[in-house]
Regions:
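Solenoid-repeat scaffolds in large eukaryotic assemblies
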Residues: 199-203
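Short, well-structured alpha-helical segments
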Residues: 212-223
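Alpha-helical transmembrane bundle of multi-pass membrane proteins
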Residues: 1-198, 224-443
Length: 443
């Protein structure tokens, strides 16, 4: 049974995931109005969509630095401030350039939260429920995506400035996130790593009073072993977790997930749906994502990370292959015009159950304490570099190569992911962070 305090701290920290998801998806309802308002070319339009992702890449690359130096909790507070400033600034932006600046700041918050939030939750969670608790971050991401899609749908017809309202409502959860963060403690592993033994033990006592001494000894022993080795992430003993994190994050994005999240209304319009139906279908994607992430998070500690990835990979291969065939044959009117939306709903279900539920859990588990923030930053930045590439190039390739070839590429990448999971992915369920370190790190 998870301590109520640990659950509360995890839920609060996972609010960073809600803002992450909302910020990611909200632009899908505003992008066409923004393009028309400022008369953007296709290149400028692509840059407008991807500027937040560029900020996200930088936030992910460097988010481990304040997390290590200032602490996990203080870094999360600054992330909340970035979300708030971005939401208000983008909603009130008088021109394209300041709009881009504020979207960039929001991207920094997304990137840094993808490093610090899973990291913090993994460091306060007991081994037997770590998957579920860290999975709250991904659950809140998709909850944020769903909320953004529904918000966009409800605000779409309120007037010519509806896109400003779509972007501005994000300020409300950002304020809540900032205020609640003053009720969470610092990570006990970060405190012990920085020699603050009494404070670290106090937090461990709040987590599980019966195991304070054993947990402290295990963490300090692991840190002592790490202290005999290089703290550089690129040292040879960290080769296995580094390769696992990079590969996992790479495959997460070449599944095409963010192309579908960002451009869902346009993809549906390509199949002949009207704008209103396309926006509503996008909200359906958010709902499916929400439900199957909830399922994945609830079973990840029972069936394990690897099993979820195997099931998901097979489902993604099947659905992407069928979507590609639909575009090749142009038979969009089958099943009342709902063939492609139905297949993409199934695609989202398989993704949410597997990659969506697993990625932040797995990457937060596989690095030792001394380099965990750096490793999380590496996995997150790889994820966001690929997300930026996909978001920036998807409109171009969909137009030049067609939907069939584009979705066939994503399908091929998922075949490679299946091989990766079968050959190289270890199982980490039910193992302490220090136990995972013994398995993956060469001492």
């Amino acid at each position: 049974m998870v301590q109520r305090k640990v659950l509360f701290w995890s839920i609060v920290t996972a609010l960073g995931g809600f803002l992450f998801g909302f910020d990611t998806a909200v632009i899908s309802g505003a992008e066409k109005a923004i393009q028309q308002l400022w008369h953007l070319s296709s290149v400028e339009h692509g840059f407008t969509i991807s500027i937040a992702l560029i900020g996200t890449v930088l936030g992910a690359m460097f988010g481990g630095i304040p997390s290590d130096r200032l602490g996990r909790r203080q870094t999360l507070r600054w992330i909340a401030v970035l979300y708030l400033v971005s939401a208000v600034g983008a909603a009130l932006a008088p021109a394209w350039v300041p709009f881009m600046v504020f979207r960039f700041l929001g991207g920094l918050g997304v990137g840094a939260s993808s490093v610090t939030a899973p990291l913090y939750i993994s460091e306060i969670s007991p081994a037997e429920s770590r998957g579920k608790l860290v999975g709250l971050f991904q659950f809140n991401i998709v909850f944020g995506i769903l909320a953004a899609y529904l918000s966009n749908y409800l605000l779409a017809n309120v007037g010519e400035h509806s896109w400003r309202l779509m972007l501005g409502v994000q300020a409300v959860p950002a304020i809540a996130f900032l205020l609640f963060l003053f009720r969470v403690p610092e990570s006990p592993r970060w405190l012990l790593l920085h020699g603050r033994l009494a404070e670290g033990k106090d937090v461990l006592r709040l987590i599980n009073p019966a195991t304070v001494e054993a947990d402290t000894a295990a963490i300090l022993t692991a840190q002592a072993l790490a202290g005999q080795q290089s703290e550089s992430l690129w040292a040879s003993q960290y080769r296995t977790p580094v390769l696992l994190a990079v590969a996992f994050a790479f495959f997460n994005q070449v599944s095409g997930i963010n192309a579908i999240i960002y451009y869902a209304p346009r993809i549906f319009e390509m199949t002949g749906l009207g704008q209103g139906a396309a926006l509503l279908s996008s909200a359906g994607i958010g709902l499916v994502n929400f439900c199957f992430t909830l399922l994945g998070v609830n079973v990840i500690d029972r069936f394990g990370r690897r099993t979820l990835m195997l099931v998901g990979s097979l489902g993604l291969i099947a659905t992407l292959g069928l979507v590609a065939m639909a575009f090749y044959t142009q038979r969009f009117q089958l099943f009342g015009g709902l063939l492609v939306p139905g297949l993409l709903f199934a695609y989202i279900a398989f993704f949410a159950f597997s990659q969506g539920a697993v990625i932040w859990v797995f990457i937060s588990e596989i690095f030792p304490n001394a380099v965990r923030a750096k490793g999380q930053a590496l996995g997150s930045s790889t994820h966001w570099v690929m997300a930026t590439v996909i978001a920036f190039t998807f409109p171009y390739f969909a137009e030049r190569l067609g939907g069939g070839n584009t979705f066939a590429f994503f399908c091929g990448m998922m075949v490679l992911q299946l091989v990766f999971v079968l050959r190289f992915m270890p199982e980490t369920k039910g193992t302490s962070l220090e136990g995972v370190e013994k398995t993956l790190v060469m001492h």
